[in-house]
Amino acid sequence: NYAKDFQYAKSAAFGENYNNSNEKGLFIGANAKILPKFVLAGYFDSFTFPWLKYQVSAPSHGFDYFAQLNYTPTKSIDMYFRIRTKLKPVNTPEVVDRIDYLVDANRTNYRFNVSYAANSQWKFVNRVELITYKKGDAATSNGYVFFQDVKYKPQGLKLSIIARYMLFQTESFDARVYTYENDVMYANSIPFFSGKGSRFFALVNYEVNRNIELWVRYAQTYFTNPNVFILTNSGSLDTVIGNKKS
């Protein structure tokens, strides 16, 4: 329970908002081993905003639920299926009598992920994810992402290589896809993508000795349409001249 006038200068407590104010909620989560090789996890999060917030010009209420089923048939194979739905009111783009009114925005993610180790040197990860987004009475927009990861760590060498090839397509920016990417030490990378295209990245790590490590990373995104606008992690618009961004 965070009051709407709570001052959050140095707080970073749990909540739906990025700041700890103007929010009441209830979160319930559970994790259970239902069978010898199956684990079921999930949560339900209900949240209420007693006062106005960004892009929401009235008090509002929403919920977020998540369920994931893990199956581990062997020590070298792990797979899971996940579904997550978040519903929260937002301002409609239409203004009636100079008043913004709220409509429900529903975003649902369906994900299937498989990771398997061929041996001690090679590991592979496959993922396919579908996103649906519906706002008010507007048509549902969809998006998808598919990627293949390859991880190689040769025996006898303090070297590791990770590479990914990904395909993505979305019908709108609201149906954009997020993916975590391995990065150099102390860097965090969770980019998002909209439109249609592909992406590749490779990360190489070599341990020279116990005090020195070398990291090299290269990534490139290819867009089907040239001269596209993308939203960067900082929230500003960036123009890609051509159809490649490295």
Where do the model's predicted regions map?
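Exposed, low-structure sequence patches enriched in small/polar residues
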Residues: 1-246
